[in-house]
């Protein structure tokens, strides 16, 4: 009766944006066999990335870091470290992919560390929206709000997709670089 | 009415989008004469009618137009702005759009990508859930008015 799936085959649909992102993260996941190699490697922006392929010191870093994949506990620590290396980006991208695939509502949200620095946390949004639902004000601009968040999500997803692709390429470069030396 | 819930987990945003889409389609099928909804208010939880609340016809058109974006993706920015300008030509609205954009920029600067993602993702989830309920209410009210209550 409902042919909903067909309509998703639109270029700008959220479904496609999410799929692109999930694809990029899956690709990253498959490429990065030893995530701990990404520790302490800064994630450069694409412009810089193209120019300075031979990132100084990162090759040595690779040789030192041959430990197996870290435990989830240590993952959480570096995930919320103030300065993010490639590894924390890697963990972040995977966690966002899971949120997209499984939904975020029933997950224990914001961790204790680092939660005070940002004023916009999912909990605040929940409170804000439940307030919105009960109050009569704000009904008219639901459409605007919807559009605003849809556009925002699109923008964020495309940035994240780009990040996942950069990370995958950087990892390949790092691996290639270290193999080159041997 | 058939909702595609099996392809994704229950809480997934895509499930919520599917459900919204299906509920609005159902509403469109039920409401044969939308103009009947003019000047009809949704009664509140206690049966009270809120002053100044939009009528059901306003809801009906809004829910339909949001459904287009849910199904077909984002309108190009210019098209959206033209649409907003076409609906409400007052200066105040334009100012509001400008402040919204300024607000948007401010948020982008302040938040990291993760927080931005969660802000938009959760908000969309809630807005769509809320709108789905509204579409169901409009449908039910129409059925009541036309004596089709099952």
From Swiss-Prot, chain A:
Top-rank taxon: Eukaryota
Tissues expressing the protein: During embryonic development, expressed mainly in the neuroepithelial midline, urogenital apparatus and digits. Detected in adult white fat, liver, heart, brain and kidney. Expressed at very low levels in lactating mammary gland.
Main location: nucleus
Region (Disordered): 55-75
One GO term (biological process): protein polymerization
Cellular component aspect of the GO annotation: cytoplasm; cytosol; microtubule; microtubule cytoskeleton; nucleus; protein-containing complex
One protein family per Pfam: Spot_14
Gene Ontology terms, MF aspect: enzyme activator activity; identical protein binding; ligase regulator activity
Modification sites for Phosphoserine: 71, 74, 78
Induction: Down-regulated by fasting. Up-regulated by a carbohydrate-rich diet.
Positions of modified residues (N-acetylmethionine): 1
Coiled coil: none
Quaternary assembly: Homodimer in the absence of THRSP. Heterodimer with THRSP. The homodimer interacts with ACACA and ACACB. Promotes polymerization of Acetyl-CoA carboxylase to form complexes that contain MID1IP1 and ACACA and/or ACACB. Interaction with THRSP interferes with ACACA binding.
PANTHER family, per the entry: MID1-INTERACTING PROTEIN 1, SPOT14 FAMILY MEMBER
Family assignment from sequence similarity: Belongs to the SPOT14 family.
Protein name in UniProt: Mid1-interacting protein 1
Annotated source species: Mus musculus (Mouse)
Curated annotation (Swiss-Prot), chain B:
Tissues where the protein occurs: Mainly expressed in tissues that synthesize triglycerides.
Residue spans of biased composition, Acidic residues class: 90-104
GO cellular component entries: cytosol; nucleoplasm; protein-containing complex
Effect of deleting the gene: Decreased lipid synthesis in the lactating mammary gland. Milk has reduced triglyceride content, causing reduced weight gain in nursing pups. Adults exhibit reduced body fat content. No effect on lipid synthesis in liver. No effect on the expression of thyroid hormone-induced lipogenic genes.
Localization terms from the record: Nucleus; Cytoplasm
Entry annotated with the keyword Protein transport: no
Keywords: Cytoplasm, Lipid biosynthesis, Lipid metabolism, Nucleus, Phosphoprotein, Transcription, Transcription regulation
GO MF annotation, one: molecular function inhibitor activity
GO terms under biological process: lipid metabolic process; regulation of lipid biosynthetic process; regulation of triglyceride biosynthetic process; response to bacterium
InterPro entries hit by this protein: Lipogen_MT_Stabilize_sf, Spot_14
Annotated stretches, region: Disordered: 83-104
Residues found modified as Phosphoserine: 90
Record function comment: Plays a role in the regulation of lipogenesis, especially in lactating mammary gland. Important for the biosynthesis of triglycerides with medium-length fatty acid chains. May modulate lipogenesis by interacting with MID1IP1 and preventing its interaction with ACACA. May function as transcriptional coactivator. May modulate the transcription factor activity of THRB.
Family: Belongs to the SPOT14 family.
Quaternary structure and partners: Homodimer. Heterodimer with MID1IP1. Interacts with THRB and PLAGL1.
Descriptive protein name: Thyroid hormone-inducible hepatic protein
UniProt source species: Mus musculus (Mouse)
Gene: Thrsp
């Amino acid at each position: 009766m409902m042919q909903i799936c067909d309509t998703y085959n639109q270029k700008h649909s959220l479904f496609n944006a999410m799929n692109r992102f999930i694809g990029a993260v899956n690709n990253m996941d498959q490429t990065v066999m030893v995530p701990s190699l990404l520790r302490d490697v800064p994630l450069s922006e694409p412009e810089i990335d193209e120019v300075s392929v031979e990132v100084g010191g990162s090759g040595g870093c690779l040789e030192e870091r041959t430990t197996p994949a870290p435990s989830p506990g240590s993952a959480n620590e570096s995930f919320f470290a103030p300065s993010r290396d490639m590894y924390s980006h890697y963990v972040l991208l995977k966690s966002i992919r899971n949120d997209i695939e499984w939904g975020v509502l029933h997950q224990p949200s914001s961790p204790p560390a680092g939660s005070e620095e940002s004023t916009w946390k999912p909990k605040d949004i929940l409170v804000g929206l439940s307030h919105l639902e009960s109050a009569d004000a704000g009904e008219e601009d639901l459409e605007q709000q919807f559009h605003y968040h849809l556009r925002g999500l699109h923008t964020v997803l495309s940035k994240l997709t780009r990040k996942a692709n950069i990370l995958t390429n950087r990892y390949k470069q790092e691996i290639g670089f270290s193999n080159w030396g041997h | 009415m058939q909702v595609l819930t099996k392809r994704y987990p229950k809480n997934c945003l895509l499930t919520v989008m599917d459900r919204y889409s299906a509920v609005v389609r159902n509403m469109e099928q039920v409401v044969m004469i939308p103009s009947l909804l003019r000047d009809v208010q949704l009664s509140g939880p206690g049966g009270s009618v809120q002053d100044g609340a939009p009528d059901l016809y306003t809801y009906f058109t809004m829910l339909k137009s949001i459904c287009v974006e849910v199904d077909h993706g984002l309108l190009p920015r210019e098209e959206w702005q033209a649409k907003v300008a076409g609906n409400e030509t007052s200066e105040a609205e334009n100012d509001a759009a400008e402040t919204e954009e300024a607000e948007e920029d401010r948020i982008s600067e302040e938040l990291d990508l993760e927080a931005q993602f969660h802000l938009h993702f959760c908000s969309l989830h809630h807005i769509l859930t809320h709108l789905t309920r509204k579409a169901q209410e409009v449908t039910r009210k129409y059925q009541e008015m036309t004596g089709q209550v099952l």
